């Protein structure tokens, strides 16, 4: 039932990586259950591919099964909508505009799928997907039972949820790069015990024209500031919560601070903007820029001069090129500012 030696690099936005030993696209929950059951029978490692917009496939490919849940439906009733995990965020946003449903204006131009957005609690402009989530339905890959959770049981955090944190025993091998020994992190893995099937969103009725205008503004913002002319995986690093910076901080004004690394005169002080994401953070892009890394390249990959928190595939980059730049950024930022950046991108 699986496709063999699948050119998986054709699906993620980076367009990088070797083949998957097996690939399967599930059109509904029953197909997904059968695929998981078959993978377990064959003792295959597997990971779940959504839109692939924050994913880096290794140069060697993936030795197990890549599962793509293409569960595509939108069913609405009043101000609520039940949405399949495979629905693209752009499709859901367009739906909300057409129906005059407010709540996702901030996500205009956000790539990826609903499942991926919920899993990683996607957010920007001080808003997060959790703000409108009512409930989430998932598949337990151990028991093959469907689980439905209310919002309060989904464990949403900064770019995380119970679905990204695992919630149980390992079943797949998608992992944050920060956990891999190759980048100097822990040698443990984060597993996905559950696969998101669908989510119910609670909107508020609004003016369709105003909602559409707000969405268009966010799309134009992204087009103007993000290096979308090159294959990329969006933000590589999470923004840095102000509360986690080990430094003496001087407030210059409401939106700007001066950071003085604590008890280490060899570290550099710097002035930085502060934004709500949704709590006070220093943008990772600004820190990378202050470290003098804009435009630095390795192989076919480059730290974008346009937005330094993007590492772009400028010319047939390898996964190893991307990983080398990620490691370089982490080391330079730590050495210069005593700040540890944490990856948002996922490796498989």
Task: Tell me the role of every PLM-derived stretch.
Residues 74-76, 138, 237, 345:
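A structural signal for short hydrophobic beta-strand segments in well-ordered beta-sheet cores
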Residues 1-128:
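Anion-binding (especially nucleotide phosphate/pyrophosphate-binding) glycine-rich loop
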Residues 174-180:
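N-terminal start and proteolytic maturation junction detector
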Residues 71, 85-87, 108-110, 122, ...:
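Short, structured patches in soluble enzyme cores that scaffold and shape functional sites
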Residues 59, 77, 140-143, 205:
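Short acidic-glycine loop/turn motifs at beta-strand connectors
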Residues 3, 10-13, 55, 146-167, ...:
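Phosphate/pyrophosphate- and phosphate-bearing ligand-binding catalytic cores of soluble enzymes
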């Amino acid at each position: 039932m699986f496709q063999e030696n699948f050119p998986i690099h054709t699906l993620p936005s980076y367009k990088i990586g070797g083949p998957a030993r097996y690939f399967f696209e599930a059109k509904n929950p029953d197909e997904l259950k059968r695929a998981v059951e078959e993978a377990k029978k064959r003792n295959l490692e597997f990971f779940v591919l959504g839109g692939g917009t924050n994913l880096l496939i290794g140069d060697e490919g993936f030795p197990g099964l890549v599962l793509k849940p293409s569960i595509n439906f939108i069913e609405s009733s009043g101000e609520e909508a039940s949405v399949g995990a495979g629905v693209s965020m752009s499709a859901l946003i367009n739906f909300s505009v057409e129906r005059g449903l407010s709540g996702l204006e901030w996500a205009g131009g956000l790539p990826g799928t609903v499942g991926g957005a919920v899993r990683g609690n996607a957010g920007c402009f001080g808003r997060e997907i959790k703000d409108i989530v009512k409930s989430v339905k998932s598949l337990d890959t151990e028991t093959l039972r469907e689980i439905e959770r209310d919002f309060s049981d989904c464990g949403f955090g900064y770019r995380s949820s119970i679905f990204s944190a695992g919630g149980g025993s390992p079943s797949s091998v998608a992992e944050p790069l920060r956990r891999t020994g190759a980048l100097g992190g822990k040698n443990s893995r984060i597993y996905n015990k559950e696969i998101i099937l669908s989510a119910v969103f609670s909107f508020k009725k609004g003016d369709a024209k105003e909602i559409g205008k707000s969405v268009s503004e966010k799309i134009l913002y992204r087009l103007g500031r993000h290096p979308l002319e090159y294959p990329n995986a969006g933000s590589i690093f999470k923004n840095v919560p102000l509360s986690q910076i080990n430094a003496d901080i001087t407030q210059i004004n409401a939106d700007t601070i001066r950071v003085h690394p604590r008890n280490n005169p060899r570290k550099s002080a710097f002035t930085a903007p502060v934004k709500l994401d949704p709590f006070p953070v220093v943008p990772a892009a600004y820190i990378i820029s202050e470290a003098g890394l804009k435009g630095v390249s390795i192989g076919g990959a480059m730290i974008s001069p346009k937005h330094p928190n993007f590492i772009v595939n400028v010319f047939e980059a390898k996964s190893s090129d991307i990983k080398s730049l990620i490691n370089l950024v982490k080391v330079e930022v730590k050495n210069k500012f005593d700040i540890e950046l944490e990856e948002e991108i996922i490796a498989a």
